[in-house]
């Protein structure tokens, strides 16, 4: 594993990703970028609140920069409406609780929805 904290601290763009989904090289791969960030934070020992809150950049804006997406990435008029909505208060909460994807849209079309879970703790 490379020195993610040091590289980002030096202003170098770092992004996370993977392409192994249920294959011989990584049979546990699900395609979940949340899992990639979760593992990356642990392996790189980036457990501070700020580290965790900023880690979404590794799979979003930093990844877009790595892929040279330019102005075609991000929420702005004229761009494709491709996004997910997580069942969480913020990004820390999303990682901490493995928040479900409530809505997944690609080019403005809803691909998948998940109803909120109802949970009760009984003592």
Predicted regions and their residues:
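His/Asp/Glu-enriched, well-ordered alpha-helical/loop segment
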Residues: 2-86
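C-terminal cap of metal-dependent C-N hydrolases
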Residues: 77-123
């Amino acid at each position: 594993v490379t020195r993610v904290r040091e590289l980002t601290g030096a202003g170098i763009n770092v992004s996370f990703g993977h392409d192994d989904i249920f294959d011989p090289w990584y049979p546990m791969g699900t395609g979940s970028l949340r899992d990639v960030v979760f593992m990356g934070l642990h392996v790189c020992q980036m457990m501070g609140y700020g580290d965790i809150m900023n880690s979404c950049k590794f799979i979003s804006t930093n990844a877009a920069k790595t892929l040279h997406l330019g102005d075609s990435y991000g929420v702005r008029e004229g761009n494709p409406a491709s996004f997910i909505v997580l069942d969480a208060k913020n990004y820390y909460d999303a990682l901490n609780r493995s928040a479900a994807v409530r809505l997944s849209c690609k080019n403005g079309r809803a691909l998948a929805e998940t109803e909120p879970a109802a949970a009760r703790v009984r003592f």
